[in-house]
Amino acid sequence: IQLPRTFEEPMGLAIDGDRMAVATKHSIVLLANEPCLAPTYPRQPGTYDALYVPRSVHFAGALAVHDMVFTDQGLVGVNTLFSCLFQLDPRHSFRPVWKPPFVSALAPEDRCHL
């Protein structure tokens, strides 16, 4: 059982089937449901029907991610600090995929607070 208090400043959440992503202060944690483990959770056997287990962590820095969604192209999130929508990038903190036309440049300035 993953409790909200075990994530540092959770702000964004995406759920799609057995996948879940949680945006925290400095990272995005990807979890997967392991329903076969839930009934045997040691502290309260027979209580739960889902158990989301952390599978990977993407260290993105303090992007202030407020919302996310799983798409056919991968996880897309709202990057409030850089005023854009983004996808995770294995080499960089993020890859911008859209910004409002009135935002002249990507900068860590929260220019429009998406």
Task: Give, region by region, the residue ranges found by the protein language model.
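Conserved beta-strand positions in repeat-built beta-propeller and related beta-rich domains
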Residues: 22-26, 70, 77-82
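Structural signal for beta-propeller blades
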Residues: 28-30, 83-87
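Surface-exposed loop and turn segments in beta-propeller and other repeat-based domains
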Residues: 3, 38-61, 93-114
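Short coil/turn segments that connect the beta-strands within blades of beta-propeller domains
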Residues: 17-18, 72-74
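Short loop/turn segments that connect beta-strands within beta-propeller blades
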Residues: 34-36, 89-92
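Beta-rich catalytic cores
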Residues: 9, 16, 64, 81, ...
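Beta-propeller domains
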Residues: 1-6, 19-48
